[in-house]
């Protein structure tokens, strides 16, 4: 399989446009996470102090709306075509970003919630970019094509690296302006570069609501939804809440580290760097998890990844450790969650090969809902106990349930659809 085939076997401009659209959309989707502290300080100067629960709600809303909108945009792709759906969704995102910028320091908490809902359209881009890129290419190139088009998780790393510094120099609202300008640029590129595949290349098979309801009656749909709610939900939940967690827990240590080793006086910028480090592990190791699952089997791989997350989450909740060890534990948690994402999607195509479009939407929605629940749980833990141990214990409990679930389904999977699946189960 050669990258050169991508230019001759399909429509490379569409693949490139889909990659840019998804990558920048993911960056915009998670933008509030690295700005939460700065926005909170801005609201406080106008007399509104966000509680831990309110801060968690603000961070969770883009994840929640993105989860639901994945299914909505999936229907849009079937009815309007991928290109029109993407342009409409991107328009909403651009409007939300410009609104946030122009309101700036005068924006209210309620207005921020509406902006957060608008950013959910960016998170739903997954449901548009992947199908559009895949339509142009033959089955033998689908893995490579979807891997490239879906490599947008790295966008959140860019947020944490650059957003706090931009906010320090020009104000947090300037990050919204940068996001709006970049999104507008991508909108124009996408409008000129992307094309929906013609009928002789791809024959659409529009899905009905009944198709979704039919799959919801299959118990394996719910098992996969649970597993992805833990893996992707854990990844996106921790990613969005990472800076808030670090600032509330290790602000003194990060301040000292920044001054001594980085020459950086702004602890919020230092928190962004450490957040980027941990998130990078989960973003970059997703394909590694898929490769491990190909070799060992998805079930065994999930045992390993979820087992590691369970131990690490309990460790983080119970052991009083140094800042350096805490970052190491968070790094490993994110790494294993990222690899678990790859392992889940090593199994899904083998079980639902004929319904991958629907399953991607359903499981993606479950992942977003899991992320929303994790953010709210961490916010509740901080508000109720002035710490995060309870939140990590609850997350560990959900991971334990997922491990029990894997134990319950592994024999049935391996002796039924796994026999003819063609890959290791």
Predicted regions and their residues:
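Cytoplasmic helix-loop-helix junction between adjacent transmembrane helices
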Residues: 115-152
């Amino acid at each position: 399989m050669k990258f050169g085939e991508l230019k001759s076997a399909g429509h490379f401009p569409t693949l490139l446009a889909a990659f840019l659209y998804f990558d920048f959309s993911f960056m915009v989707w998670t933008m509030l996470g690295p700005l939460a502290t700065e926005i909170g300080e801005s609201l406080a100067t106008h007399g509104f102090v966000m509680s831990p629960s309110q801060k968690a709600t603000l961070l969770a809303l883009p994840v929640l709306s993105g989860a639901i909108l994945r299914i909505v945009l999936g229907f849009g792709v079937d009815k309007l075509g991928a290109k029109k759906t993407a342009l409409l969704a991107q328009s909403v995102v651009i409007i939300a970003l410009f609104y946030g910028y122009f309101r700036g320091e005068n924006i209210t908490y309620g207005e921020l919630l509406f902006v957060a809902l608008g950013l959910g359209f960016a998170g739903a881009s997954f449901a548009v970019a992947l199908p559009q890129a895949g339509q142009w290419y033959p089955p033998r190139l689908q893995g490579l094509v979807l891997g490239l088009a879906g490599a947008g998780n790295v966008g959140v790393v860019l947020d944490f690296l650059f957003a706090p510094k931009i906010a320090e120099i020009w104000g947090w609202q300037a990050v919204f302006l940068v996001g709006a300008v970049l999104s507008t640029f991508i909108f124009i590129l996408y409008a000129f570069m992307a094309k929906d595949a013609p009928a002789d290349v791809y024959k659409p098979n529009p899905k009905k609501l009944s198709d979704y309801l039919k799959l919801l009656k299959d118990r394996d749909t719910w098992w996969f939804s649970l597993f992805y709610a833990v893996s992707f939900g854990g990844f996106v939940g921790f990613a969005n809440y990472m800076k808030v967690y670090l600032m509330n827990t290790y602000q003194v240590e990060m301040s000292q580290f920044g001054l001594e080793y980085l020459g950086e006086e702004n602890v919020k910028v230092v928190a962004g760097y450490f957040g980027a480090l941990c998130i990078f592990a989960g973003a970059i190791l997703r394909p590694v998890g898929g490769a491990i699952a190909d070799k060992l089997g998805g079930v065994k791989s999930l045992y390993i990844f979820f087992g590691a997350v369970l131990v690490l989450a309990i460790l983080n909740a119970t052991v009083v450790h140094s800042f350096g060890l805490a970052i190491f534990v968070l790094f490993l948690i994110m790494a294993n969650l990222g690899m678990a994402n790859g392992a889940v999607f090593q199994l899904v195509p083998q079980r639902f090969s004929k319904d991958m479009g629907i399953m991607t939407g359903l499981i993606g929605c479950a992942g977003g809902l899991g992320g929303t629940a994790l953010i709210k749980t961490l916010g509740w833990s901080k508000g109720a106990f002035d710490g995060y141990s309870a939140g990590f214990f609850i997350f560990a409990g959900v991971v334990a349930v997922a491990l029990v679930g894997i134990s319950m389904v592994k024999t049935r999977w391996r002796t039924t659809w796994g026999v003819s699946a063609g890959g290791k189960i």
